[in-house]
Amino acid sequence: MPSFDIVSKVDPQTLDNALNVARKEITTRYDFRDSKTEIDLDKKASIIKVTTENSMRMNAIVDIVITRMAKQGIDAKALDMSKEEYASGPMVKRELPVKNGIDKESCKKIIKIIKDSGSKVTPAQMDDLIRVTGKKIDDLQEIIALLRSKDVGVALQFINMK
């Protein structure tokens, strides 16, 4: 019986590469000349920490990071943009947590979308992934296309197509 898994994971090395390219771009840009800007990645907690001098530069840096992540194949939905920036003296700091895994609410939403589609497939939640099984590979490919067209709120990857 053919099946595939739906996961939401970010490769830490790819994320690190994207941040290195973003750091390099920031050091060469004219509008960031002589600015005290830092981008750090806490690999254990999966948090990107951005520090700079004002909120205008902060927005520009976040845009650069998102652009570089997209060029590396990482979806912008993998970042939790809900945490606001905070100031400490003349510097502005912001933490961007990286989401790994599919939360319960998103799992329910994905399973509901799959069941409402009317395809002859069965989704099953397994910890932080969803396994979808069906009789035909064509049905599974239709489900993948359906989920790519819908906005679920998390970055989805489809792995282990058997």
UniProtKB/Swiss-Prot annotation:
InterPro entries: DUF520, UPF0234-like_C, UPF0234_N, YajQ-like_sf. Signal peptide: none annotated. One of its GO terms (molecular function) is nucleotide binding. GO terms for cellular component: cytosol. It comes from Cytophaga hutchinsonii (strain ATCC 33406 / DSM 1761 / CIP 103989 / NBRC 15051 / NCIMB 9469 / D465). Nucleotide-binding protein. Belongs to the YajQ family. Keywords: Nucleotide-binding. This is Nucleotide-binding protein CHU_2278. Pfam families: DUF520 (PF04461). PANTHER family: UPF0234 PROTEIN YAJQ. The keyword Protein biosynthesis does not apply.
